């Protein structure tokens, strides 16, 4: 029997002990990171975390469900109907779950605790930098989507409060979409985004969970007991072409992308074992699948091909139950934007410190000035783009391709490199099978990323 071992030499796997380079996803790179000592628990140590298995399932579900939910009915319409939408999600689920398991396996092998750290350690510097850039761009695009969602929900709420029909001309200046988004962003989002640390994640998580489940329940109820004034458009039963099916990929990738936050969750478990983690992510993805399918199917069948990219915009403004759903979504997004910005800012800060060769131990004044400048630039750019891109579907079509990188490409590369690092005399069939699967993941991810990004640029953005 060939002896199989994984190179666990931390000095060879790790890239650097610099905090800017190894910044935790939800921690500023400027904060000192205590190096792992010999007495510190490793990811495989049963005492390394406090999260139960059930708690891990809940956290992964919470990380998965989000703003992409509102775009799923339109994705079913794009895919060509209920059958195509279900088949696409079921087919994707296998790769989504396997990617999460691969990341946990590589986290144990490399002794790293965040997504970008795992990629850095397993795949090397170049791939690690690309991963960090992808995370920064992805969080930037998601922040734009959040601002668009705020505008979508405010339009409907303001229409009721001002007692004006949807799309009425000659509205007062203070009800203009650009003004309301800007006012909300400056009053609430910017002050929450500037601090160095964020302590409201638990409230944001609670709001996200409540809001997501409430929106799903309302969409299902409105399908079962529809309002008399709602008339569905054409109900597609088959895709116009096979390319139409792939055009729904960005929404599905964006909706199910929880891979970036999955590695810290895995390492926070009481028993971070790959087998246990496989059960956790399978249960979590089945729950997320049920929510997304319920929303997608019922929302699509309610409005048909006429469904809006933001499904809540398809409902009448006067509907009280839907208005409550809009309020939940706004509150959730107001607290989620600063968290996503914080993740992106941490990555940008790490890239900047490494590029400049700056030491982590800097005076507080320089760090504060740089943080405020980064926050203002990030905030103003996302706000400006959100004001002139009123369709959430156009944003998701772009960042959905990046989500495919986190689901397919980086886990595939990690699997290939992890298997290549094993010191074996004879390669068994399972070794070749796993390497081949890694190649399949990378190939499939590259195809989805290329196809969806090209389609987003030439069809959605330039249309």
Curated annotation (Swiss-Prot):
InterPro entries: AA_transpt_TM. It is found in: Lysosome membrane; Cell projection, Axon. Keywords: Amino-acid transport, Cell projection, Ion transport, Lysosome, Membrane, Phosphoprotein, Sodium, Sodium transport, Transmembrane, Transmembrane helix, Transport. The modification Phosphoserine is found at residue 28. One of its GO terms (cellular component) is lysosomal membrane. Highly expressed in the brain, including the hippocampus, especially in the granular layer of dentate gyrus cells and the pyramidal cell layer of the hippocampus, amygdala, thalamus, hypothalamus, in the layer of Purkinje cells in the cerebellum and the layers of cortex. Particularly strong expression in neurons of the ventromedial hypothalamus, basolateral amygdala, ventral tegmental area, and locus coeruleus. Not detected in glial cells, including astrocytes. In addition to brain, also expressed in the spinal cord (at protein level). It comes from the Eukaryota. One of its GO terms (biological process) is sodium ion transport. GO terms for molecular function: L-asparagine:sodium symporter activity; L-glutamine:sodium symporter activity. Symporter that selectively cotransports sodium ions and amino acids, such as L-glutamine and L-asparagine from the lysosome into the cytoplasm and may participates in mTORC1 activation. The transport activity requires an acidic lysosomal lumen. Belongs to the amino acid/polyamine transporter 2 family. This is Sodium-coupled neutral amino acid transporter 7.
């Amino acid at each position: 029997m060939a002896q199989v071992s994984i190179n666990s030499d931390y000095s060879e796997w790790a890239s650097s002990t610099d905090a800017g380079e190894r910044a935790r996803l939800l921690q500023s790179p400027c904060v000192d990171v205590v190096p792992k000592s010999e007495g510190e628990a490793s990811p495989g140590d049963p005492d390394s975390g406090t999260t139960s298995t059930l708690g891990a399932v809940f956290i992964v579900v919470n990380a998965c469900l989000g703003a992409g939910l509102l775009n799923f009915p339109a994705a079913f319409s794009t895919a060509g109907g209920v059958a195509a939408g279900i088949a696409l999600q079921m087919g994707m689920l296998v790769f989504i779950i396997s990617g999460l398991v691969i990341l946990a396996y590589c986290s144990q092998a490399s002794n790293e605790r965040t997504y970008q750290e795992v990629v850095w350690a397993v795949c090397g510097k170049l791939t690690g930098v690309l991963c960090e850039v992808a995370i920064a761009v992805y969080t930037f695009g998601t922040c734009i989507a959040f601002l668009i969602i705020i505008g979508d929900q405010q339009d409907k709420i303001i229409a009721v409060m001002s007692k004006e029909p949807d799309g009425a001309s000659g509205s007062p200046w203070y009800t203009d979409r650009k003004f309301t988004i800007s006012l909300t962003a400056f009053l609430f989002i910017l002050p929450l985004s500037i601090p160095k640390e964020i302590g409201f994640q638990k409230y944001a998580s609670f709001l996200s969970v409540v809001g997501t489940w409430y929106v799903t329940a309302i969409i299902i109820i409105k399908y079962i007991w529809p309002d008399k004034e709602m008339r569905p458009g054409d109900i597609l039963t088959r895709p116009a072409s096979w390319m139409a099916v792939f055009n729904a990929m960005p929404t599905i990738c964006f909706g199910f992308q929880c891979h970036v936050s999955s590695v810290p969750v895995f390492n926070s478990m009481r028993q971070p074992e790959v087998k246990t983690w496989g059960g956790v992510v399978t249960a979590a993805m089945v729950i997320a699948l049920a929510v997304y399918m319920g929303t997608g199917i019922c929302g699509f069948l309610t409005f048909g091909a006429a469904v809006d990219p933001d499904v809540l915009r398809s409902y009448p403004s006067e509907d009280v139950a839907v208005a409550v759903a809009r309020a939940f979504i706004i509150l959730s997004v107001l607290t989620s934007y600063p968290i996503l910005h914080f993740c992106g800012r941490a990555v940008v800060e790490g890239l900047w410190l490494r590029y400049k060769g700056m030491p982590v131990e800097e005076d507080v004044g320089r760090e504060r000035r740089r943080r405020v400048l980064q926050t203002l630039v990030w905030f103003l750019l996302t706000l400006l783009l959100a004001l002139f891109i009123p369709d959430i579907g156009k944003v998701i079509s772009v960042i959905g391709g990046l989500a495919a990188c986190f689901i397919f490409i980086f886990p595939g590369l990690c699997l290939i490199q992890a298997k290549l690092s094993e010191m074996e005399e004879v390669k068994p069939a399972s070794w070749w099978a796993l390497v081949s699967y890694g190649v399949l993941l990378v190939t499939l991810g590259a195809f989805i990323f290329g196809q969806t990004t090209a389609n987003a640029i030439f069809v959605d953005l330039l249309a």
